[in-house]
Amino acid sequence: IPYLDFARSGDHKVVWELNRHQHLVLLAQAWLLTSDDRYLEEIVRHMESWWEQNPYQHGINWASALEVAFRALSWIWVYHWTGHRMEPDFRRRFLEELYRHGLHLEFNLSIHFSPNTHLLGEAVALHALGVLFPGWPRSSRWRRLGRGLVLDQMDSQVLADGFHFERSPYYHLYATDMFVF
């Protein structure tokens, strides 16, 4: 399926937006505020369904490293708030899938395709995975690589006047959010 061909497949960004899993962050926050396990059950249901329908590196949800990065960042928040309440088998699978996101990012960085805001988001996610999961085999590499890329992007994307080089308020806000993260 030529999923990046708008004329043949429609707007792939609609699919990507849903698959950033920002709604799972909201479910995790709802659980954190209420302790209502229905929110956790819904997270598990969504995650298991997603894993089944989106095997590692197959399909539209693996076509953009930036989208993989956004999803990884969402999953990090979900894990941070709910990981201690996950069943052991689900938790193990969750961490395996999150690790795969890191592998995908490491080997598919947008260095040549879109080495600006895309690369920045990917680098932030890679760095976060390296810092927050220090026991993983590639953590130290991800931490160093991600941090180095973030610092490089800070130098190349921020002008002397402090504004983002694309002169877009949206990209300025996006880059600032990523640098702060």
Model-predicted regions and their roles:
Residues L4, S9-F181:
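Aromatic-lined, polymer-binding surfaces characteristic
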